Amino acid sequence: MGKYIYTYIENGQMYEESPSLAELLAKEGLSCEKIVTGRIEYIKVKDFETQIKDAQWLVFTSKNAVAGFAYNAGNVVPAGVKVAVVGKNTQNAIRTACGIEADYVSSKATGLALGEELMNVVSGRVAYLCAEVTSGSLEEAMNEYENLIKIPVYRNEPVDYDGMEYDSMNCGDIDGIIVTSGSSGERIKWLIDRLEDVLVYSIGPACSKKLMEAGIVKERIVEAEKHTYDGLVEAVRCRADEKPVMIYDKNTINIFII
């Protein structure tokens, strides 16, 4: 198998117990190189406790949101407040950070899925702990829910690249670019363009949408069926083995043999 570039966002949160993407790729015998596309900074929210004290639900769509909550609240969820999360990784983060079990875990690891499902579950004031800039998926799904408030607890700051390092890269050795977030895809658009027809592996629908909006043609995007690091590795392995993979389309996800 060839070599892959994967995007990475640096953060200082402590709730990562699962293997890293690099470890999972190495386990499959895949050579990879990291490109840092951002750095997580946590936001100190004014009157944070006041903002959440009347909430019936706290909603988290990432481990960074859990860490941002802990940065403001000291790992203590107010008594009587229920917690909803996206997927198992965020569920594990809440368990590790706050010592509690989430009351609701989405069936799919996307903000869109969580938002759609919560419309039939929640009542009262819902506090959505999120990034300063979000994909908008959960908000779109809960557009008709009038008592949803957004509380940004972290931001994803871009970083400067070492242009010389990437200018000297032997692009002929690269078999794919693995993109772990929509913002990362936007930030390395220049590298995706430079690598021309190399496939771009996307972690999920929101990421694929951002790639398309940035001008990446749909034929280049391979979307992970499971929107996790494991799912990304499976997508890469399937493509390398010429097995069926998920190809992103504007309206549907179809399976093709490539």
Regions found by a protein language model. Give the residues of each.
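Signature of uroporphyrinogen-III synthase
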Residues: 1-258
